[in-house]
Regions:
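Polytopic transmembrane helical bundles with strong interfacial aromatic enrichment
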Residues: 1-215
Length: 215
């Protein structure tokens, strides 16, 4: 029964995660780019009819991904590797961005709440771009952690109160990226679709290299 529950939650975690990240890419790569060129009537139609429905699936898929992932972490407990820990951290931050920044500001953009739609759109856009930036490193760490050769998917080793240098560098980098999502601005490295995809790929390579080799 315990094994069945684990398999069920792992499948559910993957399924709702696909919905979440798929909609994240839809918003960043398709809808946002379309709205930049759409006629006023078409833009209004998207914001009134399409966006609310898509945002409903988006935010609840994010929350369910988090909940199922939390249960899987509970099962792993001390067996969570450096990759799982960092992947889970990025996933948690991304979920908090969805509910704490993106949805709160998108309610203003789509007219469900009063406020400055331009400023709200900018805040939501920055958080959404940040999630897109973190998405590939998060997916890489979470998906491939169970398939790495023995010796590469290590556990963070604590020595005299400190852990692996690479693990710490990735941890600090993630927190700095999130700090920019909350307090910073849209930099050119994430402003366009091509830029954020490129930056996400580079970040994945850098993060994986730090975790694997700088120990």
């Amino acid at each position: 029964m315990e094994y069945f529950t684990y398999v069920l939650f792992r499948f559910a975690h993957t399924a709702v995660g696909i919905v979440w990240i798929g909609l994240l890419y839809y918003f960043n790569f398709v809808q946002t780019e379309y709205l930049k060129e759409a006629e006023p009537d078409a833009k209004s139609d998207v914001l009134k009819k399409l966006a609310p429905n898509a945002l409903w699936w988006f935010r609840w898929a994010a929350f369910l991904t988090f909940l199922t992932g939390l249960y899987l972490l509970y099962i792993l407990q001390t067996g969570a590797s450096a990759m799982i820990i960092l992947g889970a951290l990025m996933g948690t931050i991304m979920m908090l961005n969805v509910w704490g920044i993106i949805w709160r500001n998108q309610k203003i953009v789509i007219g469900l709440k009063q406020g400055d739609a331009v400023a709200a759109g900018a805040k939501a856009g920055l958080a959404s771009r940040t999630n897109t930036l973190l998405s590939l490193p998060m997916l890489y760490f979470m998906v491939f952690s169970a398939h790495m050769p023995i010796g590469t998917n290590h556990y963070p080793t604590f020595i005299n109160g400190y852990t692996d240098v690479g693990f710490l560098l990735v941890l600090v980098s993630i927190l700095l990226i999130e700090a920019n999502a909350i307090f910073g601005k849209m930099y050119p490295v994430i402003a366009s679709v091509r830029a954020v995809i490129t930056s996400s790929v580079v970040l994945t390579v850098v993060f994986s290299g730090l975790v694997y080799y700088l120990v």
